[in-house]
Protein backbone atom coordinates (compact mmCIF):
# COMPACT_ATOMS: atom_id res chain seq x y z
CA UNK A 1 0.00 0.00 0.00
CA UNK A 2 0.94 3.71 -0.10
CA UNK A 3 2.20 3.80 3.49
CA UNK A 4 4.50 0.81 3.00
CA UNK A 5 5.78 2.25 -0.28
CA UNK A 6 6.51 5.60 1.36
CA UNK A 7 8.30 3.93 4.26
CA UNK A 8 10.29 1.85 1.78
CA UNK A 9 11.40 5.02 -0.01
CA UNK A 10 12.49 6.60 3.27
CA UNK A 11 14.49 3.46 4.13
CA UNK A 12 16.14 3.62 0.69
CA UNK A 13 17.04 7.25 1.37
CA UNK A 14 18.52 6.23 4.73
CA UNK A 15 20.58 3.46 3.12
CA UNK A 16 21.81 5.92 0.47
CA UNK A 17 22.98 8.26 3.24
CA UNK A 18 24.77 5.39 4.96
CA UNK A 19 26.45 4.28 1.74
CA UNK A 20 27.65 7.77 0.75
CA UNK A 21 28.72 8.88 4.22
CA UNK A 22 32.22 10.00 3.21
CA UNK A 23 30.92 12.21 0.39
CA UNK A 24 28.36 13.71 2.76
CA UNK A 25 31.02 14.50 5.37
CA UNK A 26 33.29 16.10 2.76
CA UNK A 27 30.45 18.26 1.40
CA UNK A 28 29.29 19.24 4.90
CA UNK A 29 32.82 20.31 5.88
CA UNK A 30 33.25 22.30 2.65
CA UNK A 31 29.93 24.06 3.31
CA UNK A 32 31.37 25.36 6.57
CA UNK A 33 33.71 27.65 4.62
CA UNK A 34 31.07 29.86 2.94
CA UNK A 35 28.84 29.58 6.02
CA UNK A 36 31.66 30.84 8.25
CA UNK A 37 32.38 33.72 5.87
CA UNK A 38 28.69 34.66 5.65
CA UNK A 39 28.35 34.41 9.44
CA UNK A 40 31.28 36.77 9.96
CA UNK A 41 29.99 39.30 7.40
CA UNK A 42 26.29 39.30 8.41
CA UNK A 43 25.49 42.69 9.93
CA UNK A 44 24.41 42.62 13.56
CA UNK A 45 21.70 45.16 14.38
CA UNK A 46 22.02 46.62 17.88
CA UNK A 47 19.23 49.16 17.33
CA UNK A 48 16.43 47.59 19.34
CA UNK A 49 14.14 50.53 18.51
CA UNK A 50 14.23 49.66 14.81
CA UNK A 51 11.96 46.68 15.56
CA UNK A 52 9.16 48.86 16.93
CA UNK A 53 6.15 49.60 14.69
CA UNK A 54 6.73 52.74 12.63
CA UNK A 55 3.31 54.21 13.47
CA UNK A 56 3.80 54.61 17.23
CA UNK A 57 4.43 58.09 18.64
CA UNK A 58 7.98 57.32 19.79
CA UNK A 59 9.10 56.25 16.30
CA UNK A 60 7.31 59.20 14.67
CA UNK A 61 9.12 61.52 17.05
CA UNK A 62 12.48 59.90 16.31
CA UNK A 63 11.88 60.27 12.56
CA UNK A 64 11.08 63.98 13.01
CA UNK A 65 14.23 64.44 15.10
CA UNK A 66 16.31 62.92 12.32
CA UNK A 67 14.60 64.78 9.47
CA UNK A 68 14.25 68.24 11.03
CA UNK A 69 17.16 68.39 13.47
CA UNK A 70 19.61 65.79 12.16
CA UNK A 71 19.59 64.20 15.61
CA UNK A 72 18.75 60.73 16.88
CA UNK A 73 20.21 59.60 20.17
CA UNK A 74 21.60 61.75 22.96
CA UNK A 75 23.67 61.35 26.11
CA UNK A 76 24.20 63.34 29.26
CA UNK A 77 27.92 63.76 29.95
CA UNK A 78 28.75 64.63 33.55
CA UNK A 79 32.16 66.21 34.15
CA UNK A 80 33.83 66.22 37.56
CA UNK A 81 36.76 68.25 38.86
CA UNK A 82 37.45 70.34 35.74
CA UNK A 83 37.85 74.07 35.33
CA UNK A 84 35.66 75.86 32.80
CA UNK A 85 38.54 76.04 30.32
CA UNK A 86 39.15 72.29 30.65
CA UNK A 87 35.45 71.63 30.10
CA UNK A 88 35.55 73.77 26.94
CA UNK A 89 38.53 71.74 25.67
CA UNK A 90 36.70 68.50 26.43
CA UNK A 91 33.62 69.81 24.66
CA UNK A 92 35.69 70.60 21.54
CA UNK A 93 37.12 67.06 21.55
CA UNK A 94 33.61 65.61 21.70
CA UNK A 95 32.35 67.91 18.93
CA UNK A 96 35.14 66.64 16.65
CA UNK A 97 34.00 63.01 16.95
CA UNK A 98 32.15 61.46 13.99
CA UNK A 99 28.36 61.19 14.44
CA UNK A 100 28.28 63.85 17.17
CA UNK A 101 25.75 66.40 15.89
CA UNK A 102 25.79 68.98 18.70
CA UNK A 103 27.12 69.49 22.21
CA UNK A 104 25.16 71.81 24.50
CA UNK A 105 26.80 73.30 27.58
CA UNK A 106 26.23 76.65 29.20
CA UNK A 107 28.87 78.25 26.93
CA UNK A 108 26.50 77.45 24.05
CA UNK A 109 24.22 80.14 25.47
CA UNK A 110 26.68 82.50 27.20
CA UNK A 111 30.41 83.19 27.27
CA UNK A 112 32.29 81.28 29.98
CA UNK A 113 33.61 84.60 31.33
CA UNK A 114 30.05 85.30 32.45
CA UNK A 115 29.57 83.98 36.00
CA UNK A 116 27.25 80.99 36.08
CA UNK A 117 25.40 82.57 38.99
CA UNK A 118 23.91 85.27 36.73
CA UNK A 119 22.30 82.66 34.50
CA UNK A 120 18.57 81.96 34.96
CA UNK A 121 18.19 79.74 38.04
CA UNK A 122 16.66 76.75 36.24
CA UNK A 123 19.34 76.94 33.56
CA UNK A 124 22.09 77.08 36.17
CA UNK A 125 20.62 74.12 38.08
CA UNK A 126 20.39 72.11 34.87
CA UNK A 127 24.06 72.50 33.96
CA UNK A 128 25.59 72.45 37.44
CA UNK A 129 25.62 70.66 40.76
CA UNK A 130 27.91 71.16 43.72
CA UNK A 131 30.83 69.12 42.34
CA UNK A 132 30.18 68.71 38.63
CA UNK A 133 28.81 70.18 35.43
CA UNK A 134 26.68 68.67 32.69
CA UNK A 135 26.83 68.61 28.89
CA UNK A 136 24.17 67.30 26.51
CA UNK A 137 25.56 65.45 23.50
CA UNK A 138 23.32 64.85 20.47
CA UNK A 139 24.17 62.22 17.84
CA UNK A 140 23.25 62.13 14.16
CA UNK A 141 22.27 58.45 14.38
CA UNK A 142 19.53 56.59 16.27
CA UNK A 143 19.75 55.88 20.00
CA UNK A 144 21.21 52.41 19.37
CA UNK A 145 22.55 53.01 15.87
CA UNK A 146 26.03 51.85 14.90
CA UNK A 147 27.24 55.44 14.49
CA UNK A 148 26.00 56.46 17.93
CA UNK A 149 27.67 53.52 19.66
CA UNK A 150 30.93 54.15 17.80
CA UNK A 151 30.78 57.78 18.97
CA UNK A 152 30.17 56.66 22.58
CA UNK A 153 33.29 54.46 22.43
CA UNK A 154 35.41 57.31 21.05
CA UNK A 155 34.02 59.77 23.61
CA UNK A 156 35.12 57.44 26.39
CA UNK A 157 38.58 57.24 24.83
CA UNK A 158 39.11 61.02 24.56
CA UNK A 159 37.38 62.31 27.71
CA UNK A 160 39.13 60.34 30.45
CA UNK A 161 38.00 59.20 33.88
CA UNK A 162 36.60 62.58 34.94
CA UNK A 163 33.74 62.29 32.43
CA UNK A 164 30.75 60.01 32.88
CA UNK A 165 28.65 59.27 29.78
CA UNK A 166 25.10 58.30 30.70
CA UNK A 167 21.87 57.59 28.84
CA UNK A 168 20.32 54.76 26.87
CA UNK A 169 22.90 54.97 24.07
CA UNK A 170 25.70 54.36 26.57
CA UNK A 171 23.80 51.46 28.15
CA UNK A 172 23.19 49.82 24.77
CA UNK A 173 26.87 50.26 23.88
CA UNK A 174 27.83 48.38 27.04
CA UNK A 175 25.21 45.72 26.31
CA UNK A 176 26.70 45.25 22.84
CA UNK A 177 30.21 44.87 24.23
CA UNK A 178 29.01 42.52 26.96
CA UNK A 179 27.07 40.38 24.47
CA UNK A 180 30.00 40.14 22.06
CA UNK A 181 32.37 39.27 24.89
CA UNK A 182 30.28 36.72 26.78
CA UNK A 183 28.19 34.96 24.09
CA UNK A 184 31.08 32.67 23.09
CA UNK A 185 31.78 31.94 26.76
CA UNK A 186 28.26 30.78 27.62
CA UNK A 187 28.02 28.71 24.41
CA UNK A 188 31.24 26.92 25.46
CA UNK A 189 29.81 26.40 28.97
CA UNK A 190 26.57 24.99 27.49
CA UNK A 191 28.52 22.60 25.24
CA UNK A 192 30.70 21.38 28.12
CA UNK A 193 27.75 20.82 30.47
CA UNK A 194 25.63 19.05 27.83
CA UNK A 195 28.61 16.90 26.80
CA UNK A 196 29.23 15.85 30.41
CA UNK A 197 25.58 14.92 30.93
CA UNK A 198 25.49 12.96 27.66
CA UNK A 199 28.78 11.19 28.41
CA UNK A 200 27.27 9.93 31.67
CA UNK A 201 23.78 9.10 30.41
CA UNK A 202 24.79 7.58 27.05
CA UNK A 203 26.64 4.26 26.66
CA UNK A 204 29.68 5.76 24.88
CA UNK A 205 32.00 8.54 25.97
CA UNK A 206 32.68 9.54 22.35
CA UNK A 207 29.16 9.75 20.91
CA UNK A 208 28.42 13.16 22.56
CA UNK A 209 31.33 14.60 20.55
CA UNK A 210 29.63 13.66 17.28
CA UNK A 211 26.30 14.98 18.56
CA UNK A 212 28.00 18.31 19.23
CA UNK A 213 29.84 18.33 15.90
CA UNK A 214 26.71 17.70 13.82
CA UNK A 215 24.62 20.23 15.78
CA UNK A 216 27.49 22.73 15.74
CA UNK A 217 27.72 22.48 11.96
CA UNK A 218 23.96 23.05 11.69
CA UNK A 219 24.31 26.13 13.92
CA UNK A 220 27.06 27.54 11.66
CA UNK A 221 24.90 26.86 8.58
CA UNK A 222 22.01 28.65 10.29
CA UNK A 223 24.06 31.70 11.29
CA UNK A 224 25.70 31.80 7.85
CA UNK A 225 22.42 31.73 5.93
CA UNK A 226 21.27 34.78 7.91
CA UNK A 227 23.27 36.78 5.38
CA UNK A 228 20.30 36.47 3.02
CA UNK A 229 18.26 38.55 5.49
CA UNK A 230 20.87 41.32 5.41
CA UNK A 231 21.10 41.54 9.20
CA UNK A 232 19.95 39.98 12.47
CA UNK A 233 19.52 41.49 15.91
CA UNK A 234 22.17 41.07 18.59
CA UNK A 235 19.56 39.32 20.74
CA UNK A 236 18.94 36.73 18.01
CA UNK A 237 22.68 36.23 17.58
CA UNK A 238 23.16 35.72 21.32
CA UNK A 239 20.29 33.23 21.71
CA UNK A 240 20.40 31.20 18.49
CA UNK A 241 23.27 28.81 19.23
CA UNK A 242 22.13 27.76 22.72
CA UNK A 243 18.45 27.54 21.72
CA UNK A 244 19.22 25.48 18.63
CA UNK A 245 21.46 23.18 20.67
CA UNK A 246 18.71 22.56 23.23
CA UNK A 247 15.86 22.19 20.73
CA UNK A 248 17.60 19.79 18.31
CA UNK A 249 19.59 17.60 20.73
CA UNK A 250 16.64 15.21 21.16
CA UNK A 251 16.74 14.40 17.44
CA UNK A 252 20.33 13.12 17.75
CA UNK A 253 19.54 11.03 20.83
CA UNK A 254 16.58 9.44 19.05
CA UNK A 255 18.71 8.53 16.02
CA UNK A 256 21.40 6.93 18.21
CA UNK A 257 18.92 4.81 20.16
CA UNK A 258 17.13 3.75 16.97
CA UNK A 259 20.48 2.78 15.42
CA UNK A 260 21.29 0.60 18.45
CA UNK A 261 17.91 -1.14 18.24
CA UNK A 262 18.29 -1.80 14.51
CA UNK A 263 21.77 -3.23 15.04
CA UNK A 264 20.05 -5.98 17.03
CA UNK A 265 17.61 -6.53 14.15
CA UNK A 266 20.36 -6.57 11.51
CA UNK A 267 23.51 -7.89 13.23
CA UNK A 268 26.67 -7.31 11.22
CA UNK A 269 25.00 -4.96 8.71
CA UNK A 270 25.58 -1.47 10.09
CA UNK A 271 24.60 0.36 6.90
CA UNK A 272 21.22 -1.38 6.83
CA UNK A 273 20.72 -0.71 10.54
CA UNK A 274 21.52 2.98 10.01
CA UNK A 275 19.21 3.16 6.99
CA UNK A 276 16.29 1.96 9.12
CA UNK A 277 17.37 4.24 12.00
CA UNK A 278 17.29 7.24 9.66
CA UNK A 279 13.84 6.16 8.43
CA UNK A 280 12.54 5.83 12.00
CA UNK A 281 14.05 9.19 12.95
CA UNK A 282 12.48 10.99 9.99
CA UNK A 283 9.07 9.45 10.74
CA UNK A 284 9.19 10.43 14.41
CA UNK A 285 11.14 13.68 14.36
CA UNK A 286 9.41 15.40 11.44
CA UNK A 287 6.12 15.61 13.35
CA UNK A 288 7.65 17.05 16.51
CA UNK A 289 9.92 19.41 14.57
CA UNK A 290 6.98 20.79 12.58
CA UNK A 291 5.22 21.80 15.81
CA UNK A 292 8.45 23.40 17.05
CA UNK A 293 8.87 25.28 13.77
CA UNK A 294 5.24 26.43 13.93
CA UNK A 295 5.84 27.72 17.46
CA UNK A 296 8.80 29.80 16.34
CA UNK A 297 7.00 31.06 13.24
CA UNK A 298 4.11 32.21 15.45
CA UNK A 299 6.52 34.85 16.77
CA UNK A 300 6.44 36.41 13.29
CA UNK A 301 2.97 37.79 14.04
CA UNK A 302 4.29 40.07 16.82
CA UNK A 303 3.99 43.80 16.19
CA UNK A 304 7.43 44.06 17.79
CA UNK A 305 9.29 42.74 14.75
CA UNK A 306 12.16 41.33 16.78
CA UNK A 307 9.81 38.33 16.91
CA UNK A 308 10.08 37.94 13.13
CA UNK A 309 13.86 38.11 13.34
CA UNK A 310 14.16 35.51 16.10
CA UNK A 311 11.27 33.33 14.88
CA UNK A 312 12.54 32.89 11.32
CA UNK A 313 16.14 32.26 12.39
CA UNK A 314 15.10 29.65 14.96
CA UNK A 315 12.62 27.95 12.60
CA UNK A 316 15.39 27.75 10.01
CA UNK A 317 17.69 26.37 12.69
CA UNK A 318 15.27 23.54 13.50
CA UNK A 319 14.98 22.60 9.81
CA UNK A 320 18.77 22.57 9.43
CA UNK A 321 19.03 20.62 12.70
CA UNK A 322 16.73 17.88 11.37
CA UNK A 323 18.64 17.71 8.08
CA UNK A 324 21.94 17.50 9.94
CA UNK A 325 20.57 14.79 12.24
CA UNK A 326 19.64 12.45 9.36
CA UNK A 327 22.64 13.17 7.13
CA UNK A 328 25.76 14.43 8.93
CA UNK A 329 25.31 12.59 12.25
CA UNK A 330 24.76 9.13 10.66
CA UNK A 331 27.82 9.73 8.50
CA UNK A 332 29.90 10.56 11.58
CA UNK A 333 28.63 7.50 13.47
CA UNK A 334 29.36 5.04 10.65
CA UNK A 335 32.72 6.58 9.76
CA UNK A 336 33.98 6.52 13.34
CA UNK A 337 32.13 3.38 14.42
CA UNK A 338 35.25 1.59 15.71
CA UNK A 339 36.28 4.53 17.89
CA UNK A 340 32.75 4.77 19.30
CA UNK A 341 32.73 1.04 20.09
CA UNK A 342 36.07 1.32 21.92
CA UNK A 343 34.70 4.04 24.22
CA UNK A 344 31.54 2.17 25.17
CA UNK A 345 30.78 1.79 28.87
CA UNK A 346 28.07 0.41 31.08
CA UNK A 347 25.06 2.67 31.48
CA UNK A 348 25.47 4.65 34.70
CA UNK A 349 21.83 5.70 34.96
CA UNK A 350 19.83 2.79 36.44
CA UNK A 351 16.81 1.31 34.69
CA UNK A 352 13.62 3.31 35.15
CA UNK A 353 11.27 0.37 34.54
CA UNK A 354 10.07 0.23 38.15
CA UNK A 355 9.46 3.97 38.24
CA UNK A 356 7.61 3.98 34.91
CA UNK A 357 5.52 1.01 36.02
CA UNK A 358 4.63 2.81 39.27
CA UNK A 359 3.63 5.97 37.37
CA UNK A 360 1.34 3.95 35.08
CA UNK A 361 -0.28 2.06 37.98
CA UNK A 362 -0.69 5.13 40.19
CA UNK A 363 -1.41 7.69 37.49
CA UNK A 364 -4.26 9.22 39.52
CA UNK A 365 -1.74 10.37 42.16
CA UNK A 366 0.24 12.36 39.61
CA UNK A 367 -2.87 13.80 37.96
CA UNK A 368 -4.09 14.99 41.37
CA UNK A 369 -0.66 16.43 42.23
CA UNK A 370 -0.47 18.37 38.97
CA UNK A 371 -3.99 19.77 39.42
CA UNK A 372 -3.15 20.88 42.97
CA UNK A 373 0.15 22.44 41.85
CA UNK A 374 -1.67 24.23 39.03
CA UNK A 375 -3.39 26.54 41.53
CA UNK A 376 -0.22 28.18 42.97
CA UNK A 377 1.32 28.11 39.49
CA UNK A 378 -1.56 30.17 38.06
CA UNK A 379 -1.38 32.54 41.02
CA UNK A 380 2.36 33.01 40.53
CA UNK A 381 1.91 33.52 36.79
CA UNK A 382 -0.57 36.35 37.34
CA UNK A 383 1.30 38.06 40.20
CA UNK A 384 4.97 38.30 39.29
CA UNK A 385 6.46 41.62 38.24
CA UNK A 386 7.73 42.21 34.71
CA UNK A 387 10.60 44.66 34.21
CA UNK A 388 11.29 46.56 30.99
CA UNK A 389 14.40 48.40 32.12
CA UNK A 390 17.27 47.03 30.03
CA UNK A 391 19.97 48.06 32.49
CA UNK A 392 18.39 46.68 35.67
CA UNK A 393 20.25 43.35 35.43
CA UNK A 394 23.55 44.66 34.06
CA UNK A 395 26.73 44.62 36.20
CA UNK A 396 26.87 47.70 38.43
CA UNK A 397 30.49 48.45 37.49
CA UNK A 398 29.76 49.07 33.80
CA UNK A 399 30.66 52.60 32.67
CA UNK A 400 27.08 53.45 31.70
CA UNK A 401 25.58 52.16 34.96
CA UNK A 402 28.12 54.10 37.02
CA UNK A 403 27.37 57.23 34.96
CA UNK A 404 23.60 56.83 35.32
CA UNK A 405 23.96 56.41 39.09
CA UNK A 406 26.10 59.54 39.35
CA UNK A 407 23.60 61.49 37.23
CA UNK A 408 20.82 60.44 39.59
CA UNK A 409 22.83 61.33 42.70
CA UNK A 410 24.20 64.67 41.46
CA UNK A 411 21.32 66.00 39.35
CA UNK A 412 18.29 63.94 40.49
CA UNK A 413 17.90 62.89 36.86
CA UNK A 414 17.12 59.18 36.35
CA UNK A 415 15.62 59.47 32.87
CA UNK A 416 15.40 62.10 30.14
CA UNK A 417 12.85 62.54 27.36
CA UNK A 418 12.54 64.66 24.24
CA UNK A 419 9.28 66.42 23.46
CA UNK A 420 8.53 67.94 20.05
CA UNK A 421 6.24 70.98 20.06
CA UNK A 422 5.01 73.24 17.26
CA UNK A 423 7.68 75.88 16.56
CA UNK A 424 4.95 78.49 16.04
CA UNK A 425 3.83 78.32 19.67
CA UNK A 426 4.21 81.67 21.42
CA UNK A 427 6.98 81.94 24.02
CA UNK A 428 4.40 82.73 26.70
CA UNK A 429 2.46 79.54 25.92
CA UNK A 430 5.65 77.45 25.81
CA UNK A 431 6.82 78.75 29.18
CA UNK A 432 3.40 78.14 30.70
CA UNK A 433 3.42 74.57 29.35
CA UNK A 434 6.92 73.98 30.75
CA UNK A 435 5.87 75.26 34.18
CA UNK A 436 2.88 72.91 34.14
CA UNK A 437 5.22 70.03 33.25
CA UNK A 438 7.59 70.90 36.09
CA UNK A 439 4.64 70.73 38.49
CA UNK A 440 4.01 67.10 37.51
CA UNK A 441 5.20 64.75 40.26
CA UNK A 442 8.54 63.21 39.36
CA UNK A 443 9.55 65.79 36.74
CA UNK A 444 12.88 67.37 37.74
CA UNK A 445 13.15 69.87 34.87
CA UNK A 446 11.61 70.93 31.55
CA UNK A 447 13.82 73.01 29.25
CA UNK A 448 13.32 74.50 25.82
CA UNK A 449 14.95 77.28 23.83
CA UNK A 450 12.90 79.93 25.64
CA UNK A 451 14.04 78.79 29.08
CA UNK A 452 17.66 78.51 27.96
CA UNK A 453 17.92 82.08 26.66
CA UNK A 454 15.54 83.61 29.20
CA UNK A 455 12.48 85.82 28.58
CA UNK A 456 14.50 89.06 28.41
CA UNK A 457 16.46 88.09 25.28
CA UNK A 458 14.62 88.37 21.93
CA UNK A 459 14.85 85.19 19.88
CA UNK A 460 15.82 87.24 16.80
CA UNK A 461 19.25 88.11 18.20
CA UNK A 462 20.12 84.49 19.04
CA UNK A 463 22.73 83.13 16.58
CA UNK A 464 21.27 80.63 14.12
CA UNK A 465 23.92 78.09 15.14
CA UNK A 466 22.48 78.11 18.66
CA UNK A 467 18.81 78.33 17.71
CA UNK A 468 19.03 75.46 15.19
CA UNK A 469 20.04 73.05 17.95
CA UNK A 470 16.60 73.24 19.56
CA UNK A 471 14.34 74.75 16.92
CA UNK A 472 13.52 74.09 13.25
CA UNK A 473 10.97 75.60 10.87
CA UNK A 474 8.27 73.18 12.06
CA UNK A 475 9.28 71.97 15.49
CA UNK A 476 10.97 73.00 18.70
CA UNK A 477 12.75 70.55 20.96
CA UNK A 478 12.01 70.38 24.68
CA UNK A 479 13.98 68.27 27.15
CA UNK A 480 12.20 66.78 30.14
CA UNK A 481 14.04 65.16 33.05
CA UNK A 482 12.50 62.76 35.52
CA UNK A 483 13.62 61.50 38.91
CA UNK A 484 11.96 58.14 38.12
CA UNK A 485 13.91 55.25 36.62
CA UNK A 486 13.74 54.55 32.88
CA UNK A 487 10.91 52.17 31.86
CA UNK A 488 9.44 52.15 35.38
CA UNK A 489 5.69 52.30 35.96
CA UNK A 490 6.12 55.73 37.57
CA UNK A 491 7.91 57.32 34.61
CA UNK A 492 5.45 55.79 32.13
CA UNK A 493 2.55 57.22 34.11
Regions found by a protein language model. Give the residues of each.
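Structured non-transmembrane domains adjacent to transmembrane bundles in polytopic membrane proteins
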Residues: 54-75, 79-172, 392-493
Amino acid sequence: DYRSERRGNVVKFGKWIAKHRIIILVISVLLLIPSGIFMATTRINYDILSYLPKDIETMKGQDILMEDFGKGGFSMVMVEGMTDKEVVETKKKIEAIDHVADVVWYDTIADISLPKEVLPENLYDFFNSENSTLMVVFFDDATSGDGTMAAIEEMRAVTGKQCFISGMSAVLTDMKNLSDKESVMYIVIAVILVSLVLAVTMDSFLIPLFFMLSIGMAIIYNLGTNMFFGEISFITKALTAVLQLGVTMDFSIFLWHSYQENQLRFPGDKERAMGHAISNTISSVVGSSVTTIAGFLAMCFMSFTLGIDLGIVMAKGVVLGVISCVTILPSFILTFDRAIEKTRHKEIIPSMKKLSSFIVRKSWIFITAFVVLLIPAIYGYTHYDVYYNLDSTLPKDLDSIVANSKLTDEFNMSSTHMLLADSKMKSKDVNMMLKDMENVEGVSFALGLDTLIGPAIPEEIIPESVKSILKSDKWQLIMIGSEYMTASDEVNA
